[in-house]
Every structure is written in C-alpha cells, then in structure tokens.
Amino acid sequence: MIPFGGTEIQHRFLSHYVDDKLLDNFQICTSIPGKVELDKNKINILWQKNSYDQPNIYPWFEDKTNHDKYDWYIFNSHWNYEKYRYRFDIPTHKCHVIKNAVNNFPVLTPYKTGDMVRMLFHVTPWRGLNVLLGAMSLLQDCNVHVDIYSSCKIYGEDFEKQNEEKYEPLYEQARRLENVNYIGYKEHSFIQKFIYRYHMFAYPSTWEETSCNAALEAMAAGLYCIVTNYGALYE
C-alpha cells in the first residue's frame, strides 16, 4: 500500500482538474525540497504542506542559498506561510497561498431529537485521540457514540510497521469503551461514501495542523465540527 494522506489527496485533485498539457509546464515537488528533481525547462514549484519544524525540511530552508532554487512556494494555509516567512525569511514575492480543496458534498442525514449522536474521528492517532477517548470516558451515560477510523496505515505499510505498535494502548482503550467503536484504517473513498451518516466530527487536536482535509471534508458534508484552534485549524 502506498501512502494516501492529505498531500496525496490534493495532488490527485490537481491531476484530475487541471489539464495535463498545462501541468506539463510545471515541475511540482510536494513538501520535502529535492524530493523531485528541479527541471530547468519548467517552472519549479515547491508545494509546501508540512510544518516548518520538520527535521527533513527546516535544515534546507535555514540555508538561504536554497531559496532561489524554486520559482514558486505554494502553501496550503496562511498560517503555514506565515510560519515559513517568519522563521526562514523566505522571498515573499515567490510565495502564494492556495488552500486545500474538497469535492464531496453529500446530503447529511438529519438529526432528530432522541437519536444517538454519531461522531466521527478519522485522523491519525497522535492528533488528539487520547484527548477524545478521555472525553468519551466521561460521557458514558449520554446518547453519544464515536466511530474511530485511526491508524498509521494511511502513510503506507512501512510507516505502519514502524509506528503502529506504540499506539496500541490507545486502540485498546478505545475497544474497552462502550460508546466507542474502534474500526481502524479505511480508505479515503470509504469515509467519503459514508460520512453523511454522522452528525459531528470530533477532533480535539493536539497537533499543529498546516491545514486539515478531514475537517474540510466534514464541514462540506454538513457535520458539526468540534476542533481546537491549533495551527491552521482556525482557518
């Protein structure tokens, strides 16, 4: 399995909605400088979706001789752009913000008084799953239920093998709670197909998001979103 997180979703949108002949004029590298070789015959773009403090990113930006290597730096939120501008003094005339997109706008199942409130959590476990489970343990007598689609598998089998075990205690905690249904990884298409069944997106994030596809998709589906204001989530 290849990784299919937010970056891959947005890259697929670009390939789907932009004409191939137009795209062929650009050499687009996502997030990690040098991951895709520069092409002197094309317009070179670094499409930055990762945080400024990542160890495979900030050393490159700290060396200002690198800043002219790309023609454009595209950021997925104003928060992310401002962090790079402030931290690395990047050339602002080469920077632009293009926010993440969604293309799924389902009709939400209406909530009726007395129905079970169905919540959704479909992000990686280090982004606040521990906080959500703590909250759910306090809601045992309420008519509230959460389905948890959380796993390291979204970033590929190698990443899963290296990291999944450390989150097993959280998954086990989820399995023990009666108002929590731990499902684990499901493909993005599955979540998009069935998101209309939920009423709320519960995301007590402890992670500085540079953007959040999961929140955007939940909002587009009409879910009530409970999120923190960490990183770019307020946008």
Q: Where is each model-derived feature located?
A:
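Short alpha-helical segment that forms part of, or immediately flanks, the ligand-binding pocket
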Residues: 192, 215-220, 234-235
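Short hydrophobic beta-strand element within catalytic cores of glycosyltransferases
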Residues: 224-227
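Active-site proximal beta-strand in glycosyltransferases
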Residues: 27-56, 67, 71-75, 96-98
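Short alpha-helical donor nucleotide-sugar binding micro-motif in glycosyltransferases
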Residues: 192-198
